[in-house]
Amino acid sequence: MTKLSVNINKIALIRNSRKGNNPSLEFFSKKIIESGAHGITVHPRPDLRHIRPDDLSDISLITKELDVEFNIEGNPYEERLGDYPGFLNLIDAVKPSQCTLVPDDSNQLTSDHGWNIHSEHNKLKDVLTYLKQNNIRSSVFIDPDISQLDAAKDVGVDRIEIYTGPFAEAFEKNDENTLATYKEAIEYANEINIEVNAGHDLNLENLATLLSYGDIKEV
């Protein structure tokens, strides 16, 4: 069964725009889980535009109490900046169920491309080793590229998360070539025994098509 992990960044963005703690991340995390989600996802960024470091312990506690997964996304190379302690320091403090590594820069609006694992192999390997030593499942954000899947297998990642922004656009335009690229990538990942997550712009209209391409563990 494909599991659903809900990203609560936008709830945090609204909260921060209003100041105070309304809407409450804790309240809505519980509501999301009670509604059937299998996990909560956050992506803390150095500019603290939405998720803040002090949110993480409360969300972690809720996910443990309600027996669902906690997935923290981010760039492992982001270092301490003001009140942001650095990404790996956050991971070390919280030790989530899953850590999804994304290649965003600090000023990026949203995740919009995957890693070049070939060029980042050695640095990513060090991070993946740390995650494994701490019993944190690793996931690496990639584009639907067979070469990157081979590199992901070689570097030792537990899962890959396929960036599905272009898939969603191709679905709207009925772009069969792009859709076929995603199908091929998911089938190949299944063949080489890399577990697959997928994320970005998925909705009730396009999700069934994506899930028909193969075994996807989480969206």
Model features per residue range: what roles?
Residues 1-69, 76-78, 82-85, 92-94, ...:
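Conserved N-terminal beta1-alpha1 strand-loop-helix module at the mouth
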Residues 1-17, 109-113, 124-133:
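N-terminal small/glycine-rich loop or linker at the start of catalytic domains
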Residues 2-8, 40-42, 68-74, 97-101, ...:
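Hydrophobic faces of well-ordered beta-strands that scaffold small-molecule active sites
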Residues 7-13, 45-47, 73-79, 102-106, ...:
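Active-site beta-loop-alpha junctions enriched in small/polar residues
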Residues 38-59, 103-116, 164-176:
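Glycine-rich, proline-tolerant flexible connector loops at the mouths of alpha/beta enzymes
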Residues 49-74, 117-139, 175-200, 204:
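Alpha-helix-loop-beta-strand connector modules within alpha/beta enzyme cores
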Residues 79-93, 145-155, 198, 202-217:
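Catalytic cores of alpha/beta
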Residues 137-192:
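Histidine/lysine/aspartate-rich catalytic loop segments that bind and position anionic ligands
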